[in-house]
Amino acid sequence: MASRMGMVAIVSLFVCALAASTSVNANVWQTDDIPVVNSNMVRHSNMERQQQQGGFIGHRPRLASFNRASNQDGDRKRTVPSGPDHMHHSIPSHTPQHPPVYVQALYEDDRSRTSSGPSKSIGPPPLSDRY
């Protein structure tokens, strides 16, 4: 069992190493840049590196920002609409416009409504005089 687990670990490491060596992102670790003091040269070398890595020339999409919205709006709170969204929560046309009428069900245990005899009072049982 231990030899089988060792074999699985070796094969998985081999697959990961193979995937890392053939992926496009593998050349991120292979940088041949020489440190440059001039800021124009640094910007130029960064542009060249970005174009070489992905083959992408032009405007790069902006990454998502996780800054709070209050920082962008001058520290004022965002207005949030209250109440239901009428576009998604409209009243369907097939529902009746009047409230439903509920009919009270008659039960066999309710003798006060089904019979005309004396009604049975509901309450605690009478105390016995056994003291």
From Swiss-Prot:
Signal peptide: 1-26
GO MF, any single term: receptor serine/threonine kinase binding
Keyword set includes Glycoprotein: yes
Example of a GO biological process term: cell-cell signaling involved in cell fate commitment
Sugar-modified residues: P84
Positions of transmembrane segments: none
A GO CC term attached to the entry: apoplast
Disordered as annotated region, ranges: 49-131
Source organism superkingdom: Eukaryota
Hydroxyproline: modified positions: P81, P84
Alphabetic keyword roster: Developmental protein, Differentiation, Glycoprotein, Hydroxylation, Secreted, Signal
Keyword Ribonucleoprotein: no
Family: Belongs to the CLV3/ESR signal peptide family.
Name this protein carries in UniProt: CLAVATA3/ESR (CLE)-related protein ESR1
Species whose genome carries this gene: Zea mays (Maize)
Lineage, top ranks: Eukaryota, Viridiplantae, Streptophyta, Embryophyta, Tracheophyta
